[in-house]
Amino acid sequence: MTEKKTTAATRGPSDHTIRDQIVAAAMEYFSHYGFEKTTVSDLARSIGFSKAYIYKFFGSKQEIGEVICANCLMDITERLNAALEQSPSATEKIKQLFQTLAVAGCELFFRERRLYDIAAASSREHWPAAVQYEDSLREIVLAILRAGRTAEEFERKTPLDETAAAVYLVLRPLADPLQLQSSLDTAREDASQLAALVLRSLAP
């Protein structure tokens, strides 16, 4: 008796591929109809899957939104890291930090206005991806300040943790989609002014 082994090819798409397909379709659907107004049933009909099949991969609509949010935040983080790597000094890094967040945030979160629902929900409800993103920005600020103090670009009298917390508070309107929404038209100019303000306060 010959046993037939089922290969990945005969089983069809992998779970990972199907998850990616659901996320891609969801992002397109949310961009047209909004995250808040869309139900899992709506999404299932648009993809051609059953509602139960989608629940096999995601426990809720929020889980799908979290993946989309995490992908967007990863894009911003990658752009930010690339910009910082090209900046020769801590002073330039501060400028790039503010400017890159303003530009990337506007492009990714508001290129499709209805995707703002996801960004807003992630910030308002403290989704894990949003919390992790905030933590990473705080670490970036701290690293820049350390480098600036070591190079004697920045003052060293104020405790480092206090300075980092203050800089992040100034940065937050550009990093938080709920706040960024109110200044889309002036975000780049605002970023330059805020960076200049921070640099004046950091001067030795």
Q: Predicted regions: what is each one?
A:
Residues M1-T7, V103, E139, A143-A151, ...:
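C-terminal peripheral helix-coil segments that are non-catalytic and often amphipathic
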Residues A25-Y29, T100, A104, V170:
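Short amphipathic alpha-helical elements of helix-turn-helix/winged-helix folds
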Residues V67, N71, N81-E107, L160-V167:
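Hydrophobic alpha-helical connector segments
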Residues D15, V23, G65, C69, ...:
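Amphipathic, non-transmembrane alpha-helical scaffold segments
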Residues T100-L142, T150:
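Short secondary-structure transition hinges
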Residues I47-F58:
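Short hydrophobic/aromatic patch on the recognition helix
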Residues T91-E92, P128-E134, T150-A166, D185-E189, ...:
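All-alpha amphipathic helical-bundle segments outside canonical DNA-binding/catalytic cores
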Residues M1-Y33, T38-F49, E63-E66:
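Basic, helix-initiating cap at the start of DNA-binding domains
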